Structure formats: C-alpha cells, structure tokens
Amino acid sequence: MQFEIITTTAQLHDFIATLDGSPISLDTEFVRTRTYAANLGLLQISQNTQITLIDPIAVGDLSSFWQAIDNKNIILHASSEDLEIIRDHKGDLNFTLFDTQIACSFLNMGASLGYAKMVETLEAVIVDKGESRTDWCARPLSEKQINYAGVDVLYLQPCLEKLQQQLENKKMFPFFEQECQSVLAQKMVKQDPDKAYKLLNNLFKLDRQGLAIIKALAKWRLLTAQERNLALNFVVKADHLWLLAYYQPTSLDDLRRLNLLPNEIRIHGQQILTIMTQVISQDESTYPPLVNRLVDFPAYKSTVKSMRDKIQLCAEKYDLPLELLASKRVINEYLSWLWKLTNLQRQTANKPKLLTGWRFELIGHQFEH
C-alpha cells in the first residue's frame, strides 16, 4: 500500500493543490479520555486511489485543508465522532456526506455495520483492527499503526460505489442522501447549556426545586468542561448531580456524606453550594415544570405496540432494519411531541424525525400529524 505522510505546512499545501472534484474518503484517529474535545492524532484521506496521512501534531494549522473540502463529496464510515472533530476544527460541515455505514443500513446489511465487516462483505478482504485502541497522539507512530490508518480509508470509495449501485437498484439512494444530510444538520445544532440537564437520568424523581438545581448544575458543569477541556464526568459525575439535586446539601460535610469524590469537593465544592443557594433563593415560578415520563402515560404501552406493528410491516415491505426506520428513540420523540405539547406548541416546534423526510413518506404519514 503506497501513501504519503504529511508533516509540514508546505507538504500540506502541495497536497491540497492535487485535490480535484472526485469524492474524498476521510477518517480520523483521535484520543478522548479525560478531555471534552477529542485530540486529533491523525487524518487519513484517499482520493482516486491515492492515500495521504496528515500528521496534525507535526503540521499544526490544518485550516487550509478544512477550507479545501468545502462543498466536496466526503465519504466516511460511522461518521458521528469524525463529524464532531471536523466541525470543531473547521467550524462548519459545508460538504456533502456519504456515510457508508448508513448505506449498509438502508441495504439491511446491519443497522451499525463496522468498517471491517463491510469490507469483508463487499471486497472479500479481511481488515486487521488490532490498532484500534492505540494512542494516536503518541509519537513516533509505528509502521503497523500507519498501515492500519491507511487501510481505514483504502476501501471506502470502492465500497461506496457498490453500495450506491445497490441503493439505486432498491430505489433508496435519495433516502440515503437525505439521511446523510440530516446527520450533518443535527451535528451543527449547538448544545444549549440551559437544556444540558435534560440529558440526565431519573429527572422524574425530582421536584421542581430539585429540577431547578440540577438544571443550574448541569449548565455550570457543561460550561466548566468546555472552558477547561475536561470530560463532563471529570468535573462532576452525572449521578452526583442528581444526588445534589435530590438531597440538596448545604455544607461541605454534607457533600462528603453524599460520597462525592474528594476532587469534586476540593475543586468545586464551594461553587456547587453557591449555585444551589442561588437557585433556592429564586422565585418558584422560575423553576422548570415536573418531568412526566412517557412510560407513565396510560396509553403508552398500547400505542407503542400499535406503532411498532405498523413499522414492522413497513420495514418488511421495504426490506429495512426496524432501528433505521423508527428506533425506540424516534418513536419516543414522536410521542413526546404528540402528548407533551399543546396544539399551539406543536405548530411552532421542530417536527419529530418520524414526521419529516423519507420516514414520513414511508411510514410517518400513517400516524397522527
């Protein structure tokens, strides 16, 4: 396998000059253990069978490359984390995405088919995944690591060409394109710190004051994590936020009794208590409403069963995996929109995934909208 390794800005500019309008296969290798943002360790690109590895640690500023892929066709596999890295470095996702994992899903090859399995199925090649857990920010990289990284983009374009033909035969290619663009759009939605608490568990067990506390603490935790580039749980563990909101301690000794980690108390203990005191002093009218679980709605089980029966028939009709067509999360998003919002609120709220695009065309139109 022949490839070029780029370690200087001059080499990068020379490489960018060779890029044409052909699809660009792309992959990233990164490390994210204690940090909020992933640390990019290697960038792999393949275009027209030419494989190039960019060393971001050696090169430094990659802005010219990110600008060069504007409006290009980009091939990725299982793109979620790659897109986050590209977004954080590039500032946007202004390109057309072709995610081969999504393509495999539309062909019912598996809802989350791995790269190695896809290559084995489509190219009859066994890919060694032995270096997947390596430290990609350590230098120097071994020959084995470099070869592994190159293979990760080597087969993307040949696989996509076969997948595209099968998708067109199945009349699913436009739906695949829609889904890929939807993934891009979702990745560009900025996380609202005021809504960070909604991603936490067991909110239904909290009263309104507890919800106000966990809302404020979750916002503070997110902003602190972003500012200090720390993984969220290295600021304060999610479970500990809930304990704070439920028991509402008033002293550092109380925090110790709740079994918060020593570092959490030493670094953030006083700040946590200050935030809680501020929330408790606020007018109750500012507190969030109680959280109603979907499973507690009387009609939930019967409605989900009825929906799943229809979705199953549709999945069989179009030979699609159930999880792609309408996963549990997609169903719950729809029911939350239907049951938790008023008619007026539904008119202005974003429509659930089930009622948009190709899902609405295939199945969503059968449900109340």
Curated annotation (Swiss-Prot):
Group of enzyme by EC: hydrolase
UniProt key word Magnesium: no
The HRDC domain, residue ranges: 207-286
InterPro entries: 3'-5'_exonuclease_dom, HRDC-like_sf, HRDC_dom, HRDC_dom_sf, RNase_D, RNase_D-like, RNAseD_HRDC_C, RNaseH-like_sf
3'-5' exonuclease domain mapped to chain residues: 4-168
Catalytic activity: Exonucleolytic cleavage that removes extra residues from the 3'-terminus of tRNA to produce 5'-mononucleotides
Major subcellular site: cytoplasm
GO MF term (any one): ribonuclease D activity
Family stated for the protein in its record: Belongs to the RNase D family.
Role played: Exonuclease involved in the 3' processing of various precursor tRNAs. Initiates hydrolysis at the 3'-terminus of an RNA molecule and releases 5'-mononucleotides.
Protein name: Ribonuclease D
Species, as recorded: Psychromonas ingrahamii (strain DSM 17664 / CCUG 51855 / 37)
